[in-house]
């Protein structure tokens, strides 16, 4: 059995342009669906966060409208409650990449607050690229790629084809106008070849060992692509 590392946010808010702290965390579907896919394939999951903080859940991600109705909302809430690893994270600072067969970053707006500027996560991402370790990143989690700054000042993901939560989706979600910055814009700024799909539809982009997904609906397909790469 191989171990797969989930790097998750420790932030329970996203600071908007006016200083307002918008409540957030990780998005349930983006953790639950890949967790189920990886464990069904026989892999062990280890969760890591900055400082070993228990990852806060974006409570909005349990709303019926995001889970196909009341039944779907209850199903994902029950599934999330059964994932004990989320309640017992290790410190990201103590992680040894060599211990893991793959690395996965679930989204939610939380990573826009902490992982986007976390140097430890940034180094882990650089090392994952260099070692060929399968790396999956979905929705807002590509914000973490912004911290992957190389010694020469460039970003390790410059030139990579990838995706992440789009400006169109952020606008439809109602937060684009109040955000300090938008993920799609920043990914383009670091030199990534951003691939935009239709809002809310699955969109997965694979470039070398990097697998990215645009939105919550892409989480399952990202996990499936990663499993093809995990030995």
Tell where the protein language model's regions lie, with residue ranges.
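Conserved active-site segments centered on acidic
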Residues: 140-142
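Conserved, well-structured core segments that form or line functional sites
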Residues: 135-136
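Extended, subdomain-level signal for the structured scaffold at the beginning of enzyme domains
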Residues: 1-131, 144-231
